[in-house]
Amino acid sequence: MLYFTIKNMKFRNLMKIINALREEEVVAYPTESMFGLGCDPDSISAVNKLIYLKKRKINKGFIIVAANISQLNNYIDCTSLSKNNLNKIFCTWPGFITWLMPPKKDIPCWLIGNNSLIAVRVSNFFPIKKICNIFGKPIISTSANLSGEIPAKNIKEIKHKLGSKIIILDHPIGKYSNPSEIRNGINYKIIRKG
């Protein structure tokens, strides 16, 4: 298994994560509240590896996390929302709120699953921003665990839950104890409390 610590989070070390993403692999990385698993959201090969690793159903859809709003342009249909809606959403980013928004018509079906909206977040958490900025696009963000189990909060738990076949970015998780809040971008309903 390959992993490294934040002390060594130099560009060349981050490139191990980026290269794994480009090679359609799954990576583990710290998020604001737990370790996450991520991959290229546009790669069916990578998504299939993620689904297999987590033993997760493909019809659930995924959250994608970005370094900035412009990275979401290929995924969300802003024309379907009023300026007021967009302002309410965008003023929470970067931040720890995931929004369900209308998707672009041509996005990969596995991102929304059986849902009509896509789950997106712009993070301000340093490791996520760094990965997405260097990768040049958002990544999938799902908890590092087998589907239905408690998410991993450290490297030892990742190894125990998922084995040693993924690259892990070893860095402390953020300050939150719960996953991100999820809100509906059309009616502002809270789907999952943060």
From Swiss-Prot:
Record's catalysed reaction(s): L-threonine + hydrogencarbonate + ATP = L-threonylcarbamoyladenylate + diphosphate + H2O
A Gene Ontology cellular-component term: cytoplasm
Pfam families the record matches: Sua5_yciO_yrdC
InterPro entries, alphabetized: DHBP_synth_RibB-like_a/b_dom (IPR017945), Sua5-like_dom (IPR006070), TC-AMP_synthase (IPR023535), TC-AMP_synthase_SUA5 (IPR050156)
UniProt keyword list: ATP-binding, Cytoplasm, Nucleotide-binding, Nucleotidyltransferase, Transferase, tRNA processing
Residue ranges constituting the YrdC-like domain according to the UniProt record: 11-194
Source organism, top-level taxon: Bacteria
Subcellular localization: Cytoplasm
Chief place where the protein resides: cytoplasm
GO MF, one example: L-threonylcarbamoyladenylate synthase
GO BP term, example: tRNA threonylcarbamoyladenosine modification
E.C. numbers: 2.7.7.87
Major enzyme class: transferase
Function comment: Required for the formation of a threonylcarbamoyl group on adenosine at position 37 (t(6)A37) in tRNAs that read codons beginning with adenine. Catalyzes the conversion of L-threonine, HCO(3)(-)/CO(2) and ATP to give threonylcarbamoyl-AMP (TC-AMP) as the acyladenylate intermediate, with the release of diphosphate.
HAMAP family the record matches: TsaC
UniProt-listed PANTHER family: SUA5 (PTHR17490), THREONYLCARBAMOYL-AMP SYNTHASE (PTHR17490:SF18)
Family: Belongs to the SUA5 family. TsaC subfamily.
Name of the protein described by the UniProt record: Threonylcarbamoyl-AMP synthase
Source organism of the structure: Wigglesworthia glossinidia brevipalpis
